[in-house]
Amino acid sequence: MNKTVETFDPKQTTTLETPAKTLAAEAKASDGTIQGNRIGFVSLGCPKNLVDSERILTQLRIDGYEVTNSYDNADLVIVNTCGFIDAAVEESLDAVREALEENGKVIVTGCLGAKENQIREVHPDVLEITGPHSYEAVLNHVHKYVPKPEHNPFTSLIPQTGVKLTPKHYAYLKISEGCDNRCTFCIIPALRGDLDSRGVGSVLDEAKRLVESGVQEILVVSQDTSAYGKDKDGRTDFWNGMPVKQDITSLARQLGKMGAWVRLHYVYPYPWVDDLIPLMAEGLILPYLDLPLQHASPRVLKMMKRPGRVDRQLDAIKKWREICPDLVIRSTFIVGFPGETEEDFEMLLDFLREARLDRVGCFKYSEVDGAVANTLAELISEEVKEDRYERFMEVQAEISAERLARLVGRELDILIDDVDEEGAIGRSYADAPEIDGMVFINGETELTPGDMVRARIVASDEHDLWAELVALED
């Protein structure tokens, strides 16, 4: 069961489960049908890394390679790594070790690939290492060790949207790379560089292809979604002969006209986030805001190099909910940041009680190699971190239960993700895949993943909802 308040677990929070399941299913379905050389593939990390994996896999298929999730019958294995926090680094290094032991020929890419010396020190036998979004370099390395098949009669079978590691009814849409912020606990700019926004026409073209292929939910991701277009100085681009400004509000407005759910992730709390709320109230995009706030103590926020006016944030949340009463706010916070005092932590709890956020992730501070925060102040003991985490979770669990209870009795659109012998499992507008809760519709075994249904909410807890089917929508 997915949780509203979660601790850090690489299998849940850093590495999504769905891509591995999808890759395994596709490999099984195509096993032996493509007479080309086989490439094993492991995709770790967040949705942004998942999109990188999809691009590499698409080009591999175009080049005639068969992709498999099995090491022993692959000619080579690619491991797309995560390097965000130390637990993710350990998971990535373990995956490389397993690939070397099972196969012996391994190419490493992704965020951890930006730290080649660290990988070579542990795994000197790795063939090649590239950093994140190095698609061309990865393919060139593959061609070097496993020559490209001369003929691939199956190229025409590759969907227009490319290979996807998500179910057919939802997809991640990455709108930019890198980040211009310098949060002291984060090393993403060192791994992925400064902000580099895609052209708005390119983004909208991809979104249109996704919707035309049957995607019903577009999850917009980047390192800093609300900063989209800042590096382009808000210049106007053109799409379908129409001028569109390169900023997140203009992009969201156009995405909202395509007829799919549009969900925004990783929205940094800039002032212009205010402009997105009316789009949610109008129903153009989902009234769901993934807004990582990280803390509520002005002193800690200053050490983090994050926006520090908590009173302004509370005022903003109040104003947003007045404009869009159905708004669901997800956020993440760090407890046990170096130098965090009991007073700082109590400020965080007070903020939770006043803000009444819907979905919250809590992370115990983890030392990240190269992060400035490690040297700012005395590190907090693991015992204190655990105590603060448990107290945080206890407070937020009660709030989450209260926020979900308000949905009981309402009819909501539910997007079905899975069906088993007990019934259907889906998500409402309040639930992003894998990180939020689920909606259980017991007894409805005739539904299909990708169905959009109308359901009446009959029960809730602090994480999930239970519903009764009202109607199957077109």
UniProtKB/Swiss-Prot annotation:
UniProt GO cellular component terms: cytosol
SMART domains cross-referenced by the UniProt entry: Elp3 (SM00729)
Cofactor(s) this protein cannot do without: [4Fe-4S] cluster
PROSITE patterns, A to Z: MTTASE_N, MTTASE_RADICAL, RADICAL_SAM, TRAM
Domain TRAM, residue spans: 405-471
MTTase N-terminal domain location: 37-147
An example molecular function term from Gene Ontology annotations: 4 iron, 4 sulfur cluster binding
Binding site for [4Fe-4S] cluster 1: C46, C82, C111
Listed GO biological process terms: tRNA modification
Free-text cofactor note: Binds 2 [4Fe-4S] clusters. One cluster is coordinated with 3 cysteines and an exchangeable S-adenosyl-L-methionine.
Reactions catalysed: L-aspartate(89)-[ribosomal protein uS12]-hydrogen + (sulfur carrier)-SH + AH2 + 2 S-adenosyl-L-methionine = 3-methylsulfanyl-L-aspartate(89)-[ribosomal protein uS12]-hydrogen + (sulfur carrier)-H + 5'-deoxyadenosine + L-methionine + A + S-adenosyl-L-homocysteine + 2 H(+)
Keywords: 4Fe-4S, Cytoplasm, Iron, Iron-sulfur, Metal-binding, S-adenosyl-L-methionine, Transferase
Subcellular location: Cytoplasm
Function (record text): Catalyzes the methylthiolation of an aspartic acid residue of ribosomal protein uS12.
Protein family: Belongs to the methylthiotransferase family. RimO subfamily.
Protein name, per record: Ribosomal protein uS12 methylthiotransferase RimO
